[in-house]
């Protein structure tokens, strides 16, 4: 059984290191780095989710998913699409319906931030902006019943 911890936007897989150390689950804990999953593809939500799904689907046994913010959205989407492949689901600060006004405001703030602020976060500034834009229409409200 694998435990997959998924970081949020503006974070890296290292964000989970202390948590995993405290839980002492390093033998079966995985922390994919989201920017690495999309490689050279355009950073849209659909591309990121497809890459995340491929990552999770490489494991035959049901997985435990724990996601923070963007990581939670990806984990939720995966649990809806593959409910039999998810043994447990922990969502932290995760929206099942994207707050459009908040995302638009966030993108506005991102536009004024220098590119250098984004370098340590894994994605380029343009990637942040595009990813947030492509998430605005996400709404899992009608699919939540698929998770038991």
State where each predicted segment sits.
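Serine-hydrolase catalytic-loop signature spanning alpha/beta hydrolases and amidase-signature enzymes
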Residues: 10-18
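Structural cue for short, hydrophobic secondary-structure segments
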Residues: 5-8, 31
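Flexible "cap/lid" loop of the alpha/beta hydrolase fold
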Residues: 45, 80-81, 86-116
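Short beta-strand immediately N-terminal to the catalytic nucleophile in serine-hydrolase-like folds
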Residues: 65-67, 92
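Active-site loop/oxyanion-hole signature of alpha/beta-hydrolase fold enzymes
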Residues: 17-21, 28-64
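Conserved serine/cysteine hydrolase catalytic core
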Residues: 133-148
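Gly/Ala-rich beta-loop-alpha elbow adjacent to hydrolase catalytic centers
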Residues: 67-71, 75
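Active-site glycine-rich loops that stabilize anionic/oxyanionic intermediates
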Residues: 8-11, 69
């Amino acid at each position: 059984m694998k435990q997959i911890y998924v970081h949020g936007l503006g974070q890296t897989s290292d964000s989970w290191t202390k948590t995993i150390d405290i839980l002492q689950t390093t033998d079966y804990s995985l922390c994919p780095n989201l920017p690495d999953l999309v490689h050279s593809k355009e950073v849209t939500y659909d591309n990121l989710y497809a890459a995340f799904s491929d990552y999770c689907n490489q494991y035959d046994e049901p997985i435990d998913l724990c996601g923070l913010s963007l990581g939670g959205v990806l984990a939720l989407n995966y649990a809806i699409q593959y409910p039999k492949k998810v043994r447990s689901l922990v969502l932290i600060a995760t929206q099942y319906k994207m707050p459009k006004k908040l995302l638009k405001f966030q993108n506005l703030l991102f536009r004024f931030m220098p590119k250098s602020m984004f370098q340590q976060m894994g994605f380029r500034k343009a990637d942040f902006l595009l990813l947030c834009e492509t998430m605005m229409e996400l709404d899992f409200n009608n699919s939540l019943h698929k998770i038991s």
